[in-house]
Amino acid sequence: MTPDMPRLTLYEAPIEGSITMDGSEKIIIDVGSPIGTPRTLEGYIDLSPMESGDTIIIRQYVKLRPDEDYRRHAEETYTGEQPLSLLYINPRPVKYGVRITAQQVTGTYKTLKYQFYIKRV
């Protein structure tokens, strides 16, 4: 590849679905990289079902070594109706693994939709 050639962005098939809250910490996505191949994860979680009285915690974990456990990288709490209801998970470099979870701690349990993309680096 010469310096003036553009780099191709290769996305794997999107990972999408929905998950129903039940009070426990639920795994939305858990992506390991085979043989430590670097990748980037980004995506969306739809918080539009949230209403007054609801509290949902979104946590992000990263694995730094293949033989280690995940370590919490970030945690955000969302309460009540969300005026910006589509939560964007910023691109996260992944070598050995990344996990995104949700836990609803108050309110009537909701079902959250999600869509994530994995990009080969």
Predicted features by range, described:
Residues 2-19, 104-121:
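C-terminal interaction-tip segments
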Residues 14-36, 50-55, 82-84:
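Surface-exposed ligand/attachment interfaces on beta-rich extracellular proteins
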Residues 25-26, 67-72:
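Tryptophan-centered short beta-strand motifs
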Residues 37-45, 90-112:
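Noncatalytic modules at the cell exterior or secretory-pathway interfaces
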Residues 47-49, 62-64, 120:
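Beta-strand elements of well-folded, non-transmembrane domains
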Residues 53-66:
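Short, surface-exposed beta-strand/strand-loop-strand elements in extracellular ectodomains
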Residues 71-81:
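Solvent-exposed serine/threonine-rich low-complexity stretches and specific carbohydrate-binding patches
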Residues 86-88:
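Catalytic micro-motifs at enzyme active sites that drive phosphoryl/nucleotidyl and oxygen chemistry
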